[in-house]
């Protein structure tokens, strides 16, 4: 079996499911166990400057093998899997030379069907790695880890010219904390790529601007039989608030570069209600306008209330569109595009309707677009990846490294 697959199967055997609303990083012990295993593997493979931080971030260096100065670049993947679905006792299935039709996932009724997932029609003849229908696969992002390490080993063994390359494996990306304790100064790269995308050719450097919005509504409860002019129903105010937002600017009505408002939770009584929203937009001005709109609605709905009744709104920015940072360094994208073309891959540029560690790192001074892993249907039992896609990702990582060295020699 290919060493790339060996590595991947080893990593998915670790249960690294992240846990939301946990203060510690990493949020689960399984992530630390995988980090320790990777630290040991990297030392055994002869990497230099191998470190493991208190927060479970592994870093290492593949030293340059050329005599001329080359910018230090980096490749980053994450240790954790989604909190949305179990990552315990992952049992991958290999489907060689896929011939079309449904793929049975383990023993039972679960199938991976081209009717539900038409991308399978494009993968005839490929080797697919699927789940057994009971867990997610963990290609997001253990495929990225396997691809990065395999690419580094091949660069070294094949003596492909390259500068210093830094690699890092981070915890808790799935719960938004991956970049929180990432030491950019210690990583010491001029730019990097997260290997955390989907199908072959994906190259992403645009993501949402993101904010979370918490709304607290305090009403006044009295006996409904004598409530006229006295009762203030917090639930009614919550309903009025939500109805003020545009009905067609929600996740289920938007795509591409559209932004949205998303009500994630609502709970309450007559006396008190709480609402939690997220706000997303690619354009910074539109993003700011959305947040202002939410404040303005709170003012309108809360106007004229008794002084003991009120609407309180707290808005926290989560992350911003990394495009603002990356367009200042166009060669980072150009190198990745050229690397893909050199590997007979058509780059697919599309916005990320979400966020990545790279978005936060880009604003910490480490420009960091995202490249593909070769995986599909993340965060659930229908997750799968192709061996061909994984090999292509390895080839692109190697080619980016080589082109960076060539570019430095020519400058």
From Swiss-Prot:
Recorded GO MF terms: metallopeptidase activity; tripeptide aminopeptidase activity; zinc ion binding
One Gene Ontology term, aspect cellular component: cytosol
Membrane spanning residue stretches: none
UniProt cross-references to Gene3D superfamilies, sorted A to Z: 3.30.70.360, Zn peptidases
Compartment(s) of residence: Cytoplasm
Binding-site list for Zn(2+) 2: 140, 174, 379
One Pfam match: Peptidase_M20
Its EC number(s): 3.4.11.4
UniProt cofactor(s): Zn(2+)
Catalytic residues as annotated in Swiss-Prot or TrEMBL: 80, 173
Catalytic activity: Release of the N-terminal residue from a tripeptide
SUPFAM superfamilies (UniProt xref): Bacterial exopeptidase dimerisation domain, Zn-dependent exopeptidases
InterPro entries, alphabetized: ArgE/DapE_CS (IPR001261), Bact_exopeptidase_dim_dom (IPR036264), Peptidase_M20 (IPR002933), Peptidase_M20_dimer (IPR011650), Peptidase_M20B (IPR010161)
GO biological process, any: proteolysis
PROSITE patterns (UniProt xref): ARGE_DAPE_CPG2_1 (PS00758), ARGE_DAPE_CPG2_2 (PS00759)
UniProt keyword annotation of Amino-acid biosynthesis present: no
Keyword Cytoplasm: yes
Function: Cleaves the N-terminal amino acid of tripeptides.
Family assignment from sequence similarity: Belongs to the peptidase M20B family.
Protein name: Peptidase T
Taxonomy of the source species: Bacteria, Pseudomonadati, Pseudomonadota, Gammaproteobacteria, Enterobacterales
